[in-house]
Amino acid sequence: ESEEEQMRQCRSRIEQLNGKGYFDWCMLDANPHMGGHFVWSYNDYARGSQDETMYSGVVDINRYPKFSYFMLQSMRDKAVSQPGLYEGPMVFIASYNASGDFASSTTDITVFSNCDEVRLYRNEKLIGTQTREERTPLFRSIVEKGGSPMFVFNAGEYETGTLKAEALVDGKIVATHSVSTPGKADRLVVDIKTDGIIPVADGSDMIPVYFKVCDKNGSLVYNS
């Protein structure tokens, strides 16, 4: 899926969590006794009834995380962590930072975080700072239930280079994420997702191994 398609899914899901429309997950917003919700389609899958792929998962058909994976991760309390899987505070830039193909890489840059404040930089220049408090009115139902708002920055004119997000709690940087504009394909990078598991060659463990096409700096070349 392209950046724009992934962002469309993120916006749809966060609107559902915020209590808008028919797909309000069993009246989650309206019912104070509803403890939470789960996503049925964790991964993209091949439909049995038709020859097509359903792109409704938060990971792709190979279990590689999509943007919405990190959107849902931002709903986790920053005090909660599980060694080997995730640490409490998180921040993620939902962009490939590539103007040529995606209009959403140029102006509105979305950042997911479960922290109090987010700063976004382009090539070391501050684009803006947003706080959880400032964003709450747009996502009140989510925040009141312990979730997090989306942080959306108007980045203005596009520049190749690096986007960097900093997440802050009590004025201190607790998490960062950077995305650099990809260059030409240069190498294959092997990414082994152990998720804290020490694999044993006894036939019981299955560990996904991904081969990513990257440029000379290690940035993912998303369209290769």
Where are these regions (language model features)?
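Extended substrate-binding grooves/exosites of carbohydrate-active enzymes
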Residues: 1-172
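Short beta-turn/strand-loop junction motif enriched in small, turn-promoting residues
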Residues: 22, 98, 197, 216-218
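Short, solvent-exposed loop/linker segments at the N-terminal edge
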Residues: 98-105, 196-207
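Beta-strand-rich structural segments
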Residues: 111-113, 204-222
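Generic structural detector for well-ordered beta-strands
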Residues: 152-156, 178-180, 191
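Edge beta-strands of extracellular beta-sandwich domains
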Residues: 171-183
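Low-complexity, acidic Ser/Thr/Pro/Gly-rich terminal tails and inter-domain linkers that flank the onset
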Residues: 182-202
